[in-house]
Structures are given as C-alpha cells and as structure tokens.
Amino acid sequence: MNRNNVIDSLFNIIEDRKDKPIEGSYTGYLFEKGLDKILKKVGEESSEVIIAAKNEDEEELIKEICDLTYHIMVLMVEKQIKLDDIEKELEKRRERICNKKNERKTIEKL
C-alpha cells in the first residue's frame, strides 16, 4: 500500500468509526468522550513527540509521530476537516517554501 493509500485508508476508518461506532473501539471512545478528550490526547501526543525527539530515539520518535498523526486525524474528523482541505493548504504553502525570509508575508496576529 502506498503512502497516500495508508493515510486515506486510516482517515476513512476514523470517519467510519464516528458514523458507525463499534463497541470497544478506541476511536469510537474518543468520539464518545468528545472534543475535550480528543484535544487532551493531541496535547499528550505532541509532548511525547517532543520528548522522543529530544532523546534522539528515532524508533520511538516514529511511533510517537504516528500516534500524534492518528489523534490529529481524529480531531480533523471531529471538526469536519477533510484531508483534501489540508492538501490544498499545503499546496498553497509549498509555493512559498523557497521564498527568502524577508520576502515572506507577515503572519497576522491572532
């Protein structure tokens, strides 16, 4: 299975678990508990990625990035954001990757 197929397949499974919960499913559990639980897991996994990177443990870092990616996908489904939405935004940003720092647009303050 190629890279996009793995990501698409996982995303489709997550969407399916939201629409048709399966008893005992961890993904279903996250959706049942709601946004606060999902956000808590995204935060936890983000911290674990940082720690694994700091500890220079490549195998652990890969695992933690996978965990974070999964939980980000759960968040995306919860907030009705599609993979295509992310791909379109990344495509827009890709055009600016080679820009020099002083040529970049300033980021609006939140």
Curated annotation (Swiss-Prot):
GO term, biological process aspect, one: L-histidine biosynthetic process
Similarity comment text for this entry: Belongs to the PRA-PH family.
Key words, A-Z: Amino-acid biosynthesis, ATP-binding, Cytoplasm, Histidine biosynthesis, Hydrolase, Nucleotide-binding
Pfam families for the chain: PRA-PH (PF01503)
Main localization of the protein described in the UniProt heading: cytoplasm
Protein name as annotated: Phosphoribosyl-ATP pyrophosphatase
Intracellular or extracellular location(s): Cytoplasm
Entry-linked NCBIfam families: histidine_hisI
Gene Ontology MF: a single term: ATP binding
Biological classification of the source: Bacteria, Bacillati, Bacillota, Clostridia, Eubacteriales
E.C. designation(s): 3.6.1.31
Membrane-traversing stretches: none
Gene source species: Clostridium botulinum (strain Hall / ATCC 3502 / NCTC 13319 / Type A)
Domain of life: Bacteria
Entry-linked InterPro entries: HisE, PRib-ATP_PPHydrolase-like
Enzyme class: hydrolase
GO CC list: cytoplasm
Catalytic activity of the protein: 1-(5-phospho-beta-D-ribosyl)-ATP + H2O = 1-(5-phospho-beta-D-ribosyl)-5'-AMP + diphosphate + H(+)
Pathway entry: Amino-acid biosynthesis; L-histidine biosynthesis; L-histidine from 5-phospho-alpha-D-ribose 1-diphosphate: step 2/9
